[in-house]
Structures are given as structure tokens and as C-alpha cells.
Amino acid sequence: MSRRRFDCRSISGLLTTTPQTPMKTENFNNFYTLTPKELGRGKFAVVRQCISKSTGQEYAAKFLKKRRRGQDCRAEILHEIAVLELARSCPHVINLHEVYETATEIILVLEYAAGGEIFNLCLPELAEMVSENDVIRLIKQILEGVHYLHQNNIVHLDLKPQNILLSSIYPLGDIKIVDFGMSRKIGNASELREIMGTPEYLAPEILNYDPITTATDMWNIGIIAYMLLTHTSPFVGEDNQETYLNISQVNVDYSEEMFSSVSQLATDFIQSLLVKNPEKRPTAESCLSHSWLQQWDFGSLFHPEETSESSQTQDLSLRSSEDKTPKSCNGSCGDREDKENIPEDDSLLSKRFRFDDSLPSPHELVPDLFC
């Protein structure tokens, strides 16, 4: 099976509606002050913190190049804008504030999520920072956001801890889903089949070049829940080939040692999602009714100010580590070669995590896995 090349001019599944947000041509710098804080960087985009000169409000400015690999990719950026507009009423999707356009770039002014990526909560060194009760709340909010997208026939296709932000870190804030550069519209007559996404988060159907459905996002939610609860990435191998083999064979460690501090209901939830056949995965809507998500301690969830002094000490530890861990991107950098989440110092990170988003096509690495 030959690899389908990424081509901005021929990708299916893009929203073609004209964005409702005005594309301003005024000088962005006349209205916003860029701070030194860079939130993310990719091959074709950079995200930086900015401050409105008129209100003093903080935002995330995402600078997207319109030409990539010599191709005009403006339609891809307009698709991302259209998805953000479609989800504007969803509290768990990052909010689009304004759009500016220059001769070479389109600038998205996005809501600023001060809590950073939930990836930081997946680090083994911060295992004591978040309880299973906290994870329940975060997963529920992710499901609510994804359910909203799926109701509108949008699949995200790159859900991962680096693309889910928090409104604040202490108290633990609300979920904001970002990075819609790989999202696609489904449900039309033509099937959507593409090799896309971050390697260790790819679903089996993407590796097999099978039709993409909303179930692909559900696989990723299973991975996110696994990482938040075990602080380990379930499928990453010692090399690229092993990673794809683990995914294809659904090699997941559910050992007592790995899940010693995880409830049986949480384990059941993950196991229901990490199944090879996408038709057997529950939908986002049905997941919201799972027994695990009903096990809430409402006191600790809605009264974070009453948490113990030790929790505040843990928060200080997290704040200190944030300087060494990946910063939030507040949106897609629009290409599978982006490395916006590679940390400057990986000494804190478990060897079970990888950050290379630019791996070759899985079909080039392990052709014997696919029929």
C-alpha cells in the first residue's frame, strides 16, 4: 500500500464555509504587545503570549504561515478558524477572539490558558499532584468537549495531553481543547482516510489506512486517561517500529504494578476505549454515563480552596517544574512535523515518553503489520 502524501491542495474533510470572524488587515502590533513568553513553536507556526493594548487582557497569538512546502495552505487555516467558530459556545474548546492576515501569515488571537498543558500532570515526578478524583473531572470535561465536536461531525484527530490545556493550575482549572490543524469533517459521501497525527497516539485504523470515524478520537481519550492515571505512555516503544507494533497489537500494560493506585472502574474505562476494532469503542456520549465518571467527591472538586497545606506545597513544586516542562501551544501548528511540545530540558521526563512528531509513515517502517 502506497503512502498518501500530505498535500494542502487536495485534503478532504475541510470545512469550506467562509469564516464569520473578520480577517483584519491592520498591523497586529498596533493592537497587541507581544511578551517574551513563547508558548509553542512548530515548523510553520509559532504561538506567543500577547496583551491587548486597549484592555490589558492576556491572549495567545498564533502566527500561521500561509505557504508550506511551497504550497498554498490558506484553506487549511480557514478550516481551523471555521472549527473554532463552530465550537465557540463550547466551554471546553479554546475561544477564538480575533484574526489578522498579512501577506505571509494569518494570526489567530486565542484565549490564553494560564494552566498550561495537562501533559505536565502526566509526568511521573508529579504523580502526587493530581488525584484520581481530579482525573475524573478532567476526563469528563474532555468528553464533553469531544462530544460537542462529534455532534457537529468534527473529529479532532490529534488529541493528546499536549493539546489539552488548563485555564489555571492552582486551583486545578477547566479543560480547553486546542490544536485543530488536523481536524476533519466527516459524514459526507466520501470516506476519510489519512495518515496523520502524533506517532505514539495513532489509532490502529489510521495505521491500517482504514476509514476515520469519531471512534479515532475515543482511542486517544483512552490514552490520555491512561497517562494521567499511570504517568506512563501506553504504546511508546524503544524505537519507532516497536511503537507501531505495540499499537497494532494493542500491547498495553494493565499489570497490578502499573495500576496499583488506580481503581477498577478507571481500568474498565480505559480498557473499553483501547480496543482495536473502532466499532467496539463507546462514543463520547456513552462514556459520560460510565460508572467511573459518577464516582465524584464533590467536596474536593468544587471547593479547591479547602485543600490541605500539603497540596499547596505540591503546587509550588509544579510551578517550579513548569520552567523545565513543555509550555502550552494554545492551538495547532498545522503540520505533523511540528515539534512545539519538545521540552528544553527532558531530565524530568520519563523515558517512556517520546516527542518526535516527524516520524516516517508507519507503512514505510513496518509493512508486515498491514494487510
Swiss-Prot record:
Binding residue positions for ATP: L39, G40, R41, G42, K43, F44, A45, V46, V47, K62
Q: How is it modified after translation?
A: Autophosphorylated.
Every Protein kinase domain range: 33-293
Q: What is its EC number?
A: 2.7.11.1
Q: Tissue range of expression?
A: Highly expressed in thymus, spleen, and testis, lower levels present in the brain.
Query: Main location per UniProt?
Result: nucleus
The active-site annotation reads: D158
Reaction(s) catalysed by this chain, per the record, are: L-seryl-[protein] + ATP = O-phospho-L-seryl-[protein] + ADP + H(+); L-threonyl-[protein] + ATP = O-phospho-L-threonyl-[protein] + ADP + H(+)
Q: In which residue ranges is the amino acid composition biased (Polar residues)?
A: 309-319
This protein's source sits in the domain of life called Eukaryota
Q: Which residues form a coiled coil?
A: none
User: What are its GO cellular component terms?
Assistant: actin cytoskeleton; endoplasmic reticulum-Golgi intermediate compartment; Flemming body; nucleoplasm; nucleus; plasma membrane
- Which molecular-function annotations from GO does this UniProt entry contain? ATP binding; protein kinase activity; protein serine kinase activity; protein serine/threonine kinase activity
Tell me, how does this one assemble? Answer: Interacts with CHP1; the interaction induces CHP1 to translocate from the Golgi to the nucleus.
Protein's UniProt name: Serine/threonine-protein kinase 17B
The uppermost taxa in this organism's lineage are:
Eukaryota, Metazoa, Chordata, Craniata, Vertebrata
